[in-house]
């Protein structure tokens, strides 16, 4: 059976519970057509690069699907009809990823931002303060530069 990665964007004013209900509806469509949804990832509400149907943010959801093309086509047809779905994209893949997607790994990495350098010593350039690093000698007296056209 063909394998697909499917991402859809739901309007920002839809609640997370309503997005879960939509996912369950689409899961039912796929299962009725003889397929299965292997993995569901909710990436949360994210800003869009540009406005889509007057929305600046959207709920992002990833579905890893194993289904015949007819079942997938029916799910996509229902998404086109739904006013809550802004956009969707389906990509056929050779195999489905078992580990979390790059978006989920990025979220995990962002959760660790509050960590500091640990037991490593503070580097001089950590604060990007610039200033004298001590690696160059004195430039000495320099003649005054003349800007503005006066000779």
UniProtKB/Swiss-Prot annotation:
Alphabetized UniProt keyword annotations: Ribonucleoprotein, Ribosomal protein, RNA-binding, rRNA-binding
Family stated for the protein in its record: Belongs to the bacterial ribosomal protein bS6 family.
Entry-linked PANTHER family: MITOCHONDRIAL 28S RIBOSOMAL PROTEIN S6, SMALL RIBOSOMAL SUBUNIT PROTEIN BS6M
One of the GO BP terms on file: translation
GO molecular-function terms, A-Z: small ribosomal subunit rRNA binding; structural constituent of ribosome
HAMAP family, per the entry: Ribosomal_bS6 (MF_00360)
Gene designation: rpsF
Organism: Methylorubrum populi (strain ATCC BAA-705 / NCIMB 13946 / BJ001)
Role summary: Binds together with bS18 to 16S ribosomal RNA.
Keyword Membrane: no
Name under which the protein is recorded: Small ribosomal subunit protein bS6
Composition bias type Basic and acidic residues, residue spans: 105-151
One Gene Ontology cellular component: cytosolic small ribosomal subunit
InterPro entries: Ribosomal_bS6 (IPR000529), Ribosomal_bS6_sf (IPR035980), Ribosomal_S6_plastid/chlpt (IPR020814), Transl_elong_EF1B/ribsomal_bS6 (IPR014717)
Region (Disordered): 97-151
């Amino acid at each position: 059976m063909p394998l697909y990665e499917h991402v859809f964007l739901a309007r920002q004013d839809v609640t997370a519970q309503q997005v879960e209900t939509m996912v369950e509806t689409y899961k039912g469509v796929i299962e009725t057509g003889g397929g299965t949804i292997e993995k569901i990832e909710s990436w949360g509400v994210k800003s869009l690069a540009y406005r889509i149907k007057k929305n600046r943010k959207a709920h992002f959801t990833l579905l890893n699907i194993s289904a015949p093309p007819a079942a997938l086509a029916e799910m996509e047809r229902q998404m086109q009809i739904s006013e809550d779905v802004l956009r969707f994209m389906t990509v056929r893949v050779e195999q489905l990823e078992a580990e979390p997607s790059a978006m989920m790994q990025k979220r995990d990495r962002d959760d660790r931002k509050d960590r500091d350098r640990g037991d490593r010593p503070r580097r001089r350039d950590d604060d990007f303060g610039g200033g004298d690093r001590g690696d160059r000698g004195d430039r000495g007296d320099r003649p005054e530069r003349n800007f503005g056209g006066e000779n």
